[in-house]
Amino acid sequence: VDRFHSISEATNGLGNTKLLNEALYDYVTIGNNEGITLAKEHLNRLYDDAGFEVLVANLFEKEGVRPEWAKPYKLHTTTDGITIAFIGLTVAYPEFYHMLDWHIEDPLIHLESILEEVRDEAHITVVLSHLGKSMDEYMAEHYDIDVILGAHTHHLFERGVLMNNTLLCCCEKWGRYVGHVQLTVDKETKRLLKKDGRAIKTERLGAYSKPLSTIEMLQEESKHIMAEPVVHLKESLPVDWFHETPFSHMLANALKTWCGAEIGMVNAGVLLEGLEEGVVTRGDIHRICPHPINPCALKVSGKTLREVILKARRPNMENLEVKGFGFRGKVMGKMIYAGVEVIPDTIPGNKLLLEDVLINGESLELDRIYTVGTIDMFTFGYLYPELSTLSDKQYYMPELLRDVLTDMLITHTSSVKL
């Protein structure tokens, strides 16, 4: 349920469930898109009409009970009497799940207990893993599992990889491949004799080019939902990924206000397009800001903030084509601030060195702690390691950046709420 897609956004994932029903799935597990980009009430309703079972062993209500729609595993017996244990595990992001009123636990603890539980009943064990390639390899090395159907890191095994007698399979992303696993079992002894898996390009399948009536129906339904008018702009709001515009500055200021911060900070590349004068709909806002990215407030030392400001000014950072972290745009673009004035050094030819940084009109103090309203993707991975290691972070969930954008447009002096 990637809310980048208008059907997922408009239906809160219910359209995705309809498509899974049509594809005749028996078992699924959830990933972080379902778990931490949907509000709890939407996740609790996501599978109301599912024609399949949802397996996720390590997700709980805060009280410690599993949600009604989830089971840890399923023992599936074929017509030949072969019992297969299907186990569902999802990646744990405790801080994010906690913000959404869930409790997520270490998937391996539950894997161990389930393997012990099904040992005497199951002839074959299959893990539906939304844990990523490295964790799948770890499970293969350390546990007695026959097949791991992988996800999360969007890797591709065109042929299944056998590791420590565990078959690792994964089909990348976006439905570009469909997986086929073949298991050969001795009917008498119920022993697994052979296993093989491959990923097949969906464009090679006969039905690939045929329009699916369910998708067409969902597209029409979503188009109607997303046509809801939000504001009427009295003037256009253009964007430029490499220069500050009133629109991008407004967004930085909106993050500052939303997070109750001293400073707002956001990259211009999060706004994929500008907005024209006139009526702006939900669909327009989703189109220009489709990212499943959350606002967050950070406590940052002046020293670290200065380092981030310097790094953000580098051409290689502004031109960086970002993949992942919730970002669905093209490039990072220029870093835009509210409450920050960057004064470059006057050395001839200088583009990077700074004479001073003013925070709300006063020189930045290296030892002072500042509150920064920004976006969660800066706290992940390699973009800004200085921010990813901060201990004092507050994420705002389930609100997404486009919710901040919507509020900003409604209160914009050159707009009228509809």
Predicted regions and their residues:
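Acidic/histidine-rich
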Residues: 137-141, 147, 244-283, 334-355
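A short C-terminal boundary segment appended to hydrolase-like catalytic domains
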Residues: 186-280, 412-418
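Feature captures C-terminal
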Residues: 276-418
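Residues that mark the start of a beta-strand
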Residues: 82-83, 262, 371
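Pocket-edge structural micro-motifs
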Residues: 56, 88, 170, 265-267, ...
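Short, glycine-/Ser/Thr-/acidic-enriched flexible segments
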Residues: 2, 91-92, 132-133, 173-175, ...
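Acidic, metal/ion-coordinating pockets
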Residues: 1-201, 242-250, 254, 395
